[in-house]
Amino acid sequence: MKETKLNRPVAAPVNNHPTDPKINLSKLNALKEAIGKNEVDTVLMVFPDMQGRWMGKRVTGPFFLDSVARHGVHACSYLLTVDMEMEPLPGFKLTSWDRGYQDFHMAPDWNTARNLAWLEKTALVICDLEDDRGRPIEAAPRQILLKQIERARAKGCLPMIGSELEFYLLRETYDTARKKITTTSPCSAPT
């Protein structure tokens, strides 16, 4: 099984990097300790999709300790091609129905490990996406952002970014609201 790479360009396995200053061992060790004390029983291994939603895998604490902490996890490249209704869209060079929806490796960025206040006994770790040779998936939103930050820094700029949170409150049921949906894609119209 492939070893996880942390905080690219570091290529050391998780258990073989005590001197690398780019690895936040304290966060990884704190997460392992919290799982051992049953303070965390679920770990969300996630990456942002093209709409900024968290995609990934929910794993149990014991499975995280036995496998994920050392090897990371895999997810289907399909997740980078879907619209808001989770319908795969055509025209992607990375992956498609014609090329196949291969898996990519989700390499944990341990600097992002944190407990979630809104989910009891749950931690979250943001991952970088890699192909089967350990190369970054250039079309992944997090990789695109990292490249833009590098470009800005090369020009002497320090990017400062904020996000906007939007939501809707509706006075109807899911069924009546669904009938009124205008989809973002003709492929995902309600039936």
Predicted regions and their residues:
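Glycine-rich, acidic/polar active-site loops that bind/position phosphate-bearing ligands
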Residues: K2-T191
